[in-house]
Structures are given as structure tokens and as C-alpha cells.
Amino acid sequence: MPGTEQAVSQVRRRAGRPAHAVLSSAHITEAALRLVAKDGYKALTMSRLAKSLNVAPSALYNHVQSKQEVLLLIEDLLMGGVDVSGFETLPWAEAVRQWGHSYRDVFSAHLPLIPVIALLPVTNAPQTIKMYEAVTQGFLQAGWPQERIIDAVVALESFIYGSAYDVNAPDDIFSVGTMAEQSPSFSAAVARRGNTDGRNDSDSAFSLGLAAMITGLAATLPQAPHSKTL
């Protein structure tokens, strides 16, 4: 009977499908990122990661060899979201400004990973290396001596990572409470900040600091044929 045969065929197809989505590096990376976001970096173990994916730990090792490799996948996922397009089309200062804001925004959403990513080698992380390659090419085109580029990038990254924390600082971080009389200059400066209510303004602080760094870095350059792009 055609109807019976079709029903049997559908049952067989359903029975042959895995009970869970097929595991992949992308699934592992996303699950690891969720785990860190929820419980912190120390919660990221291969056993907990496997449990969150509802698979045996041995299944993970078909895709990743270690926790270090999982971290590289996370690093690549995050760095792949940093906008480096400006280095192809914008003057150097504007490109660095755009890159810096994008970089800070990506990592301000993943604070527990900053201490890890900041110390993680980029070895075998293609998206991370792609990001650094675009930045390096932008610096070269602006006339930067090759031997000074990485130092400049590291200096910028140090500021960017710290500023990512400030995005998450409480609005009243500079409230002096009942000690206004003991800190008249500081209290007045807080009150006169861009926000009339004295709230923490991470964007204003970051823009000010990044502009100062860009100006300062540009000032260290020797005169070069492409310095007009600064």
C-alpha cells in the first residue's frame, strides 16, 4: 500500500537522524562563549562544555584537542567581529579610531575573557591573524616604520582592554558619598562632567583617551612620504 510504504519510509528517515544537532567547531565555540559569559572563565572545562552540549567529553575531542584550542576558537570568533574595514578606505587616524571603538565594543560584552585573550598567543587563529594583518597594512600605508608597528598596536590594545571594563562600570563609580567636604576639587570635577548628573560616561572618556593616543602616536613618526594620510 503506497500510504503505508511512505509512512514506513518517513519513520526510517526519522530513526536514522541523530537525536541532537551534529556537533561542529562552531557549536562548540558558541557553547563555550555562553558558558564563560554565564559562569566565568574558570567554569570552562571540557567536561562542563560537553555537558552543556549534551554530549560525552570524548565527542569534543573529535573537533578540538584541548581547552587551549577552544580558547583559540573563542578568540577567533571575537576578533572576527572587530571592524578593520577602515584601514582600506580611511585616513590612518580615522581608521584607528573606528577599529578602536569596534574592538572595545566587542570585548566590553565579554569581560571575563579579556585576561585570557590578552595573554593568548595568536598561533593558528586565522581570524585573529587576519585582523592584525589588516591593521599592520594600514599602519604601513600610513608610513609607519615596520619595527614600531607592533609596539603601537600593543599600546592601543592595552588602552582598549582597560576601557572595555569602564563600559561596565557603575554609573555612580565616582560618587564620594558623604565625603564631599574632604574632596572638594574631585567632587566638583565629577559634578561638572559632561553628564549633568555625574554619571559615568565611558564613551566620552574613551573618545578622549583614544584621540590623545592617536595624536601622540602620530607625533612619534618621522616625516614619511605617506604621513599626509595621518
Predicted regions and their residues:
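N-terminal intrinsically disordered/low-complexity leader segments
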Residues: 1-23, 185, 189-197, 225-230
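Helix-turn-helix
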Residues: 27, 31-69, 73
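Short hydrophobic clusters on alpha-helical segments that form packing/core surfaces
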Residues: 28-36, 74, 78, 103, ...
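Hydrophobic alpha-helical connector segments
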Residues: 84-130, 146, 156
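Hydrophobic alpha-helical bundle segments that form small-molecule/ligand-binding pockets
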Residues: 131-180, 217-221
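A surface-exposed regulatory interaction patch that couples sensing to output
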Residues: 167-201
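C-terminal all-alpha effector/ligand-binding and dimerization domain
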Residues: 203-230
